[in-house]
């Protein structure tokens, strides 16, 4: 599916790119790019830990949970210390997260993300102490530890500060070591199931037919708009990797519904390749209102014993752009954009126009506002 993104003040800037995208047919893609096998997924892990070695950019002294964590850590190490003697300026409380593939085995290394949960200003130069990462079942699957890599910096003084990117989030490449594998009998399944990332009946049926053609029999069938289930041929029992590798590299031409996505916060409009509109007349004008405040000072005459009076004044100017009706009929996305160009529509104008077209029934596509 070809997408056209309109973000700049004038739509015609994208005309050349749109023209190229419109003449291309729907592209064939690999099944692995639009679907995944059931059970073959990542599992999210999370844990709480401490980052030490910060250059005075850690949590402030009123971070009670950081003080409590430091006290508990010292106690576990057999070091008795009074909480009032602990300083937190070089320490930060953090949440540690990771994604663990279902096929990860003990000893596999994972990348971990470390995020500050207190009021630390930067994790630059910090070291994460050993942190247990748990799954939703409460069991420990990974231990994480190591030096952080931070993609930003932050520095401040009494009257000014400077920062670049986010310095309170860092990563540790390969910083997590899997201690427990996820119980999953990969080669003991009787069936395989493919899940589409975008639901569509046509694409699901097309994948089933493509798989059956490649396997030489009615092994696969679409059970709904997102799932395709298939029986495993006898020669692939207990040896499913060659079968899955063959299936995921088959080419299909995915079909999707016509859709327009609008982000009103940024003025971004994304139009799908199959968006159409019926013959309709459009006029879109801008109403510009300018309000200017001022003050008028009245001075009393000499020796009149009067007082200076300041009177506020307001000047209002209203200007409306008069635009003619334009007949637009979008057989293709290029024709639709050309028609909107003819009335001088900007992307933010386009949002209002598309909303109105949807209400009138002229927009033959789903309109989603995010």
UniProtKB/Swiss-Prot annotation:
Record keyword Zinc-finger present: no
UniProt subcellular location: Periplasm; Bacterial flagellum basal body
Main location: periplasm
MF annotations from Gene Ontology: structural molecule activity
A Pfam family: FlgI
Domain of life, per lineage: Bacteria
Signal peptide start and end residues: 1-28
UniProt GO cellular component terms: bacterial-type flagellum basal body, distal rod, P ring; outer membrane-bounded periplasmic space
InterPro entries for the chain: Flag_FlgI
GO BP: any one term: bacterial-type flagellum-dependent cell motility
Alphabetically ordered keywords of this record: Bacterial flagellum, Periplasm, Signal
Keyword Ribonucleoprotein: no
Quaternary structure note: The basal body constitutes a major portion of the flagellar organelle and consists of four rings (L,P,S, and M) mounted on a central rod.
Function: Assembles around the rod to form the L-ring and probably protects the motor/basal body from shearing forces during rotation.
PANTHER family from the UniProt entry: FLAGELLAR P-RING PERIPLASMIC PROTEIN FLGI, FLAGELLAR P-RING PROTEIN
Record-stated family: Belongs to the FlgI family.
Annotated protein name in UniProt: Flagellar P-ring protein
